[in-house]
Amino acid sequence: MTAPSCAFPVQFRQPSVSGLSQITKSLYISNGVAANNKLMLSSNQITMVINVSVEVVNTLYEDIQYMQVPVADSPNSRLCDFFDPIADHIHSVEMKQGRTLLHCAAGVSRSAALCLAYLMKYHAMSLLDAHTWTKSCRPIIRPNSGFWEQLIHYEFQLFGKNTVHMVSSPVGMIPDIYEKEVRLMIPL
């Protein structure tokens, strides 16, 4: 696995689950509560907040731009419609020396999926490497199965091959990277 070229060296990166989790020098993920914390936003020099939810309302602060991506955390939601536009926007903010906070309600599924799409597109990371890296920065990420299917399709579009596959399990279709975990939880 190769780290994103603009990521902090591992020794400076601290995994976070409650506050803002730094993924690259210009991209962070959080939950809705942290996204409305003025001190967290200002101390991390956030210039753009992308709200990937229908249920979280942002408190608007001066000097921060806001974007809404109204997608429910449902396997049937078409988050893939936003993969390219949001990845492009995150990249555009970075090119202007800005910092983006990507958040949903919990900072687990929707924002994580869009982060993975961005890392694949702009850091040429495989889906597997993007997931491994993002999980090392924010251990609680877990996109829903529908988002995984969309990410797998996107990876194939970008690179012509897949590093993650959906497999059948006692709890339904899951990405193969969760297979061992599910088997430990549900003995066959």
Swiss-Prot record:
Give the record's keywords alphabetically: Cytoplasm, Hydrolase, Membrane, Mitochondrion, Mitochondrion inner membrane, Nucleus, Protein phosphatase
Q: Which organism is it from?
A: Homo sapiens (Human)
Is Lyase one of the keywords?
no
Q: How does it sit in the membrane?
A: Peripheral membrane protein
Outcome recorded upon mutating C104S? Abolishes most of in vitro phosphatase activity
Tissues where this protein is expressed? Widely expressed with highest levels in liver, brain, ovary and testis.
Supply the InterPro entries for this chain: Atypical_DUSP_subfamB (IPR020420), Dual-sp_phosphatase_cat-dom (IPR000340), Prot-tyrosine_phosphatase-like (IPR029021), Tyr_Pase_AS (IPR016130), Tyr_Pase_dom (IPR000387), TYR_PHOSPHATASE_DUAL_dom (IPR020422)
Q: What does this protein do?
A: Can dephosphorylate single and diphosphorylated synthetic MAPK peptides, with preference for the phosphotyrosine and diphosphorylated forms over phosphothreonine. In vitro, dephosphorylates p-nitrophenyl phosphate (pNPP).
Example GO CC term: the record gives: mitochondrial inner membrane
Enzyme class of the recorded protein, top EC level: hydrolase
> Which Gene Ontology terms cover its molecular function?
MAP kinase tyrosine/serine/threonine phosphatase activity; phosphatase activity; protein serine/threonine phosphatase activity; protein tyrosine phosphatase activity; protein tyrosine/serine/threonine phosphatase activity
User: Which residue positions are annotated as catalytic?
Assistant: C104 (phosphocysteine intermediate)
Tell where it localizes.
Cytoplasm; Nucleus; Mitochondrion inner membrane
Domain Tyrosine-protein phosphatase span(s) in chain numbering: 19-160
Activity modulation notes: Activated by manganese ions, inhibited by iodoacetic acid.
Mind telling me what this protein is named?
A: Dual specificity protein phosphatase 18
Source organism superkingdom:
Eukaryota
